[in-house]
A protein has these predicted regions:
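Glycosyltransferase specificity loop/lid
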Residues: 1-101
Length: 101
């Protein structure tokens, strides 16, 4: 069995998956884990195959010059941009190595 995990590059998104991924790998499941490069050293010890994806948020950090006082209102839009940045690289890998889940 092959499972693909796609995670936003944030500790609150990655950390909860690590124990599950470790257990899946221990049970012989092949796991491909997509996340931003900064999480490679955290994900690789699980035994999953790590695939780095680009981060729109990292690439555009500090560009807008806008008032950051109402950041909560913009978070959903940031996540949409981040998901869009992931889409092509994730689909390219999965097209060649289709997961079961």
């Amino acid at each position: 069995m092959h499972i693909a995990v796609v995670s936003l590059g944030a500790f609150g998104h990655v950390n909860p998956t690590l124990e599950l991924v470790t257990e899946l790998v221990r049970r012989g499941v092949r796991v491909t884990y997509f996340c931003t490069e900064g999480f490679r050293t955290i994900v690789e010890p699980t035994g999953a195959q790590f695939v780095a994806v680009p981060s729109w948020m990292e690439a555009h950090a500090g560009e807008s010059g806008e008032d950051k006082s109402d950041v909560a209102a913009t978070v959903p839009f940031l996540f949409l941009h981040e998901a869009e940045a992931y889409l092509e690289p994730v689909l390219a890998v999965l097209k060649e190595d289709r997961p079961d889940a």
